[in-house]
Amino acid sequence: MTRESWRVPVRVDFAGGTLDLWPVYAMMGGCVTVNAAVDLWVEIGLSRSGAGHRITSRDLGLELKVEAWPPEPPPGLSWVWRVLDASGVPPADLTLHSPVPQGSGLGVSSCLGVGLLGAAMGLEAGEGLASKVPILRDLESRELQTPTGWQDYYPAALGGALALHWEGP
């Protein structure tokens, strides 16, 4: 069983953090969000083959072991399940670790989503992975049952410092 390792950076916002929400940027006639990837990494280890499925979150102290991929999100791992389910290729074994706690304001869940989708689909950081941002935004909106923006995902997908332009009509 071959084990793969993936890492994605979390991000910090400098300006325009909520301006990426529709219809805010449309009402303003366009705006800019400035953020950057930082040297704090969400780590994902996975194996694509094996019997059943196992998801382990070292930070949350959660482990899920199932024979078949569950049809509904499991408690405590619903975001992970939602992204992997959307990928169409959930791995046999998955281990997650983040040095940054959830709720820190550094976009951990969004960055985790980018890493999970990239790892499951075999997409490295770059334009290919960034093209999946609309899927992740919609999945997170469904997960949270609230509108979500775009900007949290791009530093994890592209790296570096970014000035993201949101155009109005």
Where are the predicted features?
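Anion-binding (especially nucleotide phosphate/pyrophosphate-binding) glycine-rich loop
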Residues: E4-S5, D39-L139
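ATP-dependent small-molecule kinase catalytic core of the GHMP/sugar-kinase superfamily
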Residues: T2-R11, G16-T33, S57, G122-P169
